[in-house]
A protein has these predicted regions:
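N-terminal helix-turn-helix DNA-binding module of bacterial transcription factors
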Residues: 1-66
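Flexible loop/turn connectors
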Residues: 243-346
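Short beta-strand segments enriched in small/hydrophobic residues
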Residues: 23, 63-77, 183, 191-197
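Alpha-helical recognition/docking segments in bacterial nutrient-uptake
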Residues: 1-5, 67-71, 75-182, 242
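Short acidic capping loops at alpha-helix termini that bridge into adjacent secondary structure
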Residues: 190-192, 218-221, 272-278
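Hinge/beta->alpha junction and helix N-cap segments in small-molecule ligand-binding domains
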Residues: 74-87, 105-113, 169-179, 195-238, ...
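Short acidic/polar active-site loop segments enriched in Thr and Asp
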Residues: 20, 66, 127, 190-191, ...
Length: 346
């Protein structure tokens, strides 16, 4: 059995390019100070020899691991069942891959998970962190801050210290909710119910606020809390029908809850949209197109949200730049617009 060819070394690349080992190291590790003709010779030698830098050695030089932690504050059963997370992770993955960075997925459900994640982050395994689906009063932001890692959050900050130099990407949740309710009013509906998401998350709070902006005098009996799952939407719809059987419209805080609400309405013999008009939030395809009837909903670009989170973090990781961590600097956020997509449910 023949032995495999030895792995090309930095010295072999230097000999092929006719330059010093230090010059090869600077080019391979992305440092400035090498004239372009020399840099091109090094790159050509790297290609010809099939040289692959040793990541451990490279990390010692650059102090970079080319790896980013993506922390989702949800149990794995939720993350792998809800297509929202797949969309956001796809956007993050595309951006990181385009810049030769690896994604390290960390899920946290309880305090034991928080401690495990905090130890991992403090261990110097990754260059930064992307965090989403945080819950109000979650200890994660403080743990991440103590690890000293550049971080970008998905969603508006809403925790102690959350106004100091926080980087985040969010959707115009409040404006989207207003658009949804105004659309229902334009259809002549007046007894409009709202199924909220989990109210320990800012997206649900903002959508409830948007609902109240338009329906300031609404009956509290027309609001029921869900948790962004289809089962909670179905349960909430039954509760609402029990309290207010005269309701003529529902704005659900996401498409999964809207799909659950549609099931409950069918069970109770309510026609959609004739008896009750229904609007969701997300435009989660193919769900929104496959409900019966197809769902009118507020579209947010979930994948773009993930891409922008990764892009902001990678920008902070570039040499010579750093996130603004000055106390009192205020959050530095990007808020993405939303659009109402009209289908048959309203």
């Amino acid at each position: 059995v023949s032995e495999s060819a030895p792995r090309p070394t930095l010295e072999a690349v230097a000999a092929r390019a006719g330059v010093s080992r230090a010059t090869v190291s600077r080019v391979v590790n992305g440092f400035d100070g090498v004239r372009e003709p020399l840099a091109e010779r090094v790159r050509r030698a790297v290609d010809e020899l099939g040289y692959v830098p040793n990541q451990a050695a490279r990390s010692l030089v650059t102090r970079r691991h080319d790896a980013v932690a993506v922390i989702v504050a949800e149990p794995e059963t939720r993350v792998f069942a809800d297509p929202f997370f797949a969309r956001q992770l796809r956007g993050i993955s595309k951006e990181l891959t385009a810049h030769d960075n690896q994604l390290v997925l960390l899920l946290t459900e309880d305090r034991d998970d928080h401690a495990r994640v905090a130890r991992y982050l403090a261990g110097g395994h990754v260059d930064g962190a992307l965090v989403f689906s945080l819950h109000i009063d979650d200890p994660l932001p403080g743990l991440i801050q103590r690890a000293g890692l550049p971080t970008v959050f998905g969603g508006r900050p809403h925790w102690n210290g959350g106004e100091d130099g926080v980087r985040y990407v969010d959707t115009d949740n409040r404006g989207g909710a207003r658009d949804a309710v105004r659309h229902l009013l334009s259809l002549g509906r007046s007894r409009i119910a709202h199924i909220t998401g989990a109210l320990d998350q800012t997206s649900a709070v903002d959508r409830l606020d948007g609902f109240r902006d338009v329906m300031a005098d609404t009956d509290p009996a027309l609001v029921e809390e869900g948790d962004f799952t289809a089962a909670s939407g179905e349960r909430a719809m039954r509760e609402l029908l029990g309290r207010r059987p005269d309701l003529d419209a529902v704005f659900a805080g996401n498409d999964l809850m809207a799909a659950g609400a549609l099931r409950a309405l069918r069970e109770h013999g309510r026609r959609v949209p004739d008896d009750v008009a229904v609007v969701g939030f997300d435009d989660m395809l193919p769900i929104a197109e496959q409900t019966e009837p197809p769902l009118t909903t507020v579209r947010q670009d979930i994948e773009e949200m993930g891409r922008l989170m990764a892009r902001l973090l990678l920008r902070d990781l570039e040499p010579g730049t750093a996130p603004d961590e000055t106390a009192g600097a205020g959050p530095s956020g990007v808020v993405l617009p939303v659009t109402l997509v009209r289908r048959a449910s309203a």
